Design a protein with these regions (language model features):
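Aromatic- and glycine-enriched pocket-lining scaffold segments that form the walls
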Residues: 141, 148-185
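Generic detector of leucine side chains in alpha-helical contexts
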Residues: 4-6, 11-13, 31, 82, ...
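Well-ordered alpha-helical segments within folded domains of soluble proteins
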Residues: 69-86, 116-133, 174-185
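Bacterial Sec-dependent N-terminal signal peptides
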Residues: 1-27
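Residues in flexible loops and secondary-structure boundaries
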Residues: 9-14, 55, 159, 172
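Charged/polar, low-hydrophobicity segments characteristic of intrinsically disordered regions
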Residues: 108-126, 159-168
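Low-complexity, Ser/Thr/Pro/Gly-enriched N-terminal "stalk/linker" regions
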Residues: 18-111, 134, 138-161
Length: 185
């Protein structure tokens, strides 16, 4: 009897919480319309205006114009924004950054695309493949192939039944960040 008395209020509360399904979607009606093309254009221009390093031809890590710290792997994601913008608009201002960036990150990274972290090289390789697909310039594909050769060196089966290590010094660390992008390459 005690169980029944406990269940009745619980069931009443549960059924009371079930209301009109329309309540769930009341925000879909929206107060304004978003122009996604304009939003994409604005963000693509902003990444150049706020993060592009005119002197070094790479993307700064911060947008303040003072911190010109270079981080290898975010370069790929920033360039992917410009690739998407170019595909969408065919505006030459985006394509003009491709070759500059290619040379800039190589120079800033010590004259090489090699990096101690396999996942970092994977992101750059994926971007190089996209650059090749958009421009048909062999240098991008050749660089992606060179990166892939370095990345494959990270494979070992001694730990975790196989996979690509996170970095050259931690062969036992098999993270999703170093194996997921490799699967895409």
């Amino acid at each position: 009897m005690k169980k029944l008395l406990l269940c009745v209020p619980f069931l009443a509360l549960m059924f009371q919480s079930c209301s009109n399904i329309e309540d769930e979607y009341m925000y879909d009606k929206g107060l304004y319309t978003i122009n996604w093309e304009a939003a994409a254009d604005s963000s693509s221009v902003t990444i150049i205006n706020r993060f592009w390093n005119e002197t070094g031809n790479y993307f700064n890590y911060e947008s303040d114009g003072y911190d010109e710290t270079f981080h290898y792997w975010p370069q790929a994601h920033a360039m992917d924004v410009l690739i998407d913008a170019y595909i969408r608009t065919h505006d030459a201002k985006y394509k003009d950054c491709f070759d500059k960036w290619y040379a800039g990150i190589n120079s800033k990274n010590g004259g090489s695309y090699w990096n101690n972290f396999y996942d970092d090289m994977e992101w750059i390789a994926l971007t190089m493949i996209r650059l090749y697909e958009v421009t048909d310039e062999a240098k991008y594909l050749d660089t992606a192939k060179q990166l892939w050769n370095w990345i494959k060196e990270g494979w070992n089966e001694e730990y975790c039944n196989g996979g690509i290590a996170w970095n050259h010094g931690d062969v036992w660390s098999k993270n999703a960040c170093s194996n997921g992008p490799a699967g895409l390459i």
